[in-house]
Structure formats: C-alpha cells, structure tokens
C-alpha cells in the first residue's frame, strides 16, 4: 500500500467488552462489518477510544488480528501502538505489525515531557524499526506536551514511512504550518470531529473520528462534500452532527460513545476501570440527541 491511502474517514474504534470485561469478539466483528457497509476508509483499533491503556499486549494483538481478518483487504487497519517508553513503543509497533496492522498510530510520549529532540529520536527509532507507515499522534491535552510543527515536518522529511500526523492540538497556526510545508507523501489528519469542516476546507486529508463509531456514513459524506466543494451541504450536515460531536465528550472518551453504541444495539455498555458508566443526567441528554438523529427510536 502507498502512504497516500492514509486519508479520508478513519474511525477510532471502540473495544467492546462482555459483562466480565473480557473482549467481546462477536461484537468487534459486527463493528467491523458496520464500517465495511458504511464506507469507512481506515479502522484504528487499540487507540485511546479503544481503551488501550487497559489492554494487555496479548489482547491488543488479538483485537488487531480479528479486525484485520474481518476487514480483509477492504479497509486499511492502522492500529494504535504507542507509549512513553521508546523501547516499549517499538516493541508494541512490531507486535502490531506481526498481528496484521498495515500501519500504526503512535501517541506522543506522555507524562515524561521530552524535548523536541526527544520527540524526534522517539519516532526515529519507531520508523527505523518498521516497514509500514507510522502515524504520529499529537494530542497535547492528554500527553501534557506538544510536538512542534517543525519537529513533525522534520520527521516527515527524514523518514518516508512517517506517513501522517493525527493533529489534535486545536492550534490552527500549527495545523496551517503542517499543511503548508509538508512533503508530498505526508498526510495531515485532524483528531477533532468539530473541526472536520474547516480542517478539510484548509486542505486537510481526513479525520480520525470518534463520532464515526456512531455515524460512519455521515462522517464519510461530510469529508466528501468538502472535497467536492459543496460547502453549503457540508455546513448543513455539520450543523446536524455538531451537537453529537460535543456530547461525545460530555464525559471522558470513550464513555459516551460506548453508551450510544449500547443503545444502538451494537455493544454492551461495559468499561474497564478506572472508567465508569455515564451519569444518568448525561445519559438522558445523549439519548435524546440519538433519538433526534434517528439513530435509535
């Protein structure tokens, strides 16, 4: 596959659990089939939305194998495989590759707050260890530090398999710098559903979306409308979805989206600690919006 396929609508896939918190493999297969039918371009299991901090390495490999088996060659599988220990991040990436991942999403090192050179060396080691595309995940709100645009662009220029960035900094200046100065092989994706419309209008390549768990066809359509220059229809669709985008973060992700999927009959509402079920007042608000959108009756 080419690096140019790191584009379009990518779903940050939830991990369904049974009541005993084991992985619900049947539900996982159903989710993949849902995305096959909905036009999703990329499946991203084992990321933040997939509760990756609570998954052991064997579980991550099993999830990736199932997702790849179910997706076949129809949808790219780009697995979450990152941590703040560079040696461990390389190990996770290699294991994801062995399990069937065709690309990996590697979160910026968190908590230990490396320098910009530390970020560069972290991703250099990952890129040199792999023969598949690497997507940098820059999410300062969770990691506590930002990978500067200059560092991301340096990595993209130095390593052909550093293929994309999931940019979730909410920094418009940084996004514009990445879009303006990136090499030809490098894709820039937003990690914010609320920014899909303006981001794509600025020349972005796609989104890694939480809401695509619930409304994958609509997320794909929103991207397509902007790419086709149909901004009036894109605005109408975005306005229809924007409350859902907001409510998906009324509590910590992925709690709201998993509750929504349980109401839609796709998974059980089960989380692993320290995540807990939503407060009843928030459940009521989200349920009303799902009814308004026609996702449940």
From Swiss-Prot:
<keyword id="KW-0457">Lysine biosynthesis</keyword>
<dbReference type="InterPro" id="IPR002220">
    <property type="entry name" value="DapA-like"/>
</dbReference>
<feature type="active site" description="Proton donor/acceptor">
    <location>
        <position position="137"/>
    </location>
</feature>
<dbReference type="GO" id="GO:0008840">
    <property type="term" value="F:4-hydroxy-tetrahydrodipicolinate synthase activity"/>
</dbReference>
<dbReference type="GO" id="GO:0009089">
    <property type="term" value="P:lysine biosynthetic process via diaminopimelate"/>
</dbReference>
<keyword id="KW-0963">Cytoplasm</keyword>
<protein>
    <recommendedName>
        <fullName>4-hydroxy-tetrahydrodipicolinate synthase</fullName>
        <ecNumber>4.3.3.7</ecNumber>
    </recommendedName>
</protein>
<keyword id="KW-0220">Diaminopimelate biosynthesis</keyword>
<comment type="similarity">
    <text>Belongs to the DapA family.</text>
</comment>
<keyword id="KW-0456">Lyase</keyword>
<comment type="subunit">
    <text>Homotetramer; dimer of dimers.</text>
</comment>
<dbReference type="InterPro" id="IPR020625">
    <property type="entry name" value="Schiff_base-form_aldolases_AS"/>
</dbReference>
<comment type="function">
    <text>Catalyzes the condensation of (S)-aspartate-beta-semialdehyde [(S)-ASA] and pyruvate to 4-hydroxy-tetrahydrodipicolinate (HTPA).</text>
</comment>
<dbReference type="Pfam" id="PF00701">
    <property type="entry name" value="DHDPS"/>
</dbReference>
<comment type="pathway">
    <text>Amino-acid biosynthesis; L-lysine biosynthesis via DAP pathway; (S)-tetrahydrodipicolinate from L-aspartate: step 3/4.</text>
</comment>
<feature type="site" description="Part of a proton relay during catalysis">
    <location>
        <position position="111"/>
    </location>
</feature>
<keyword id="KW-0028">Amino-acid biosynthesis</keyword>
<dbReference type="GO" id="GO:0019877">
    <property type="term" value="P:diaminopimelate biosynthetic process"/>
</dbReference>
<feature type="binding site">
    <location>
        <position position="208"/>
    </location>
    <ligand>
        <name>pyruvate</name>
    </ligand>
</feature>
<dbReference type="InterPro" id="IPR005263">
    <property type="entry name" value="DapA"/>
</dbReference>
<keyword id="KW-0704">Schiff base</keyword>
<feature type="active site" description="Schiff-base intermediate with substrate">
    <location>
        <position position="166"/>
    </location>
</feature>
<feature type="binding site">
    <location>
        <position position="49"/>
    </location>
    <ligand>
        <name>pyruvate</name>
    </ligand>
</feature>
<feature type="site" description="Part of a proton relay during catalysis">
    <location>
        <position position="48"/>
    </location>
</feature>
<dbReference type="GO" id="GO:0005829">
    <property type="term" value="C:cytosol"/>
</dbReference>
<dbReference type="InterPro" id="IPR013785">
    <property type="entry name" value="Aldolase_TIM"/>
</dbReference>
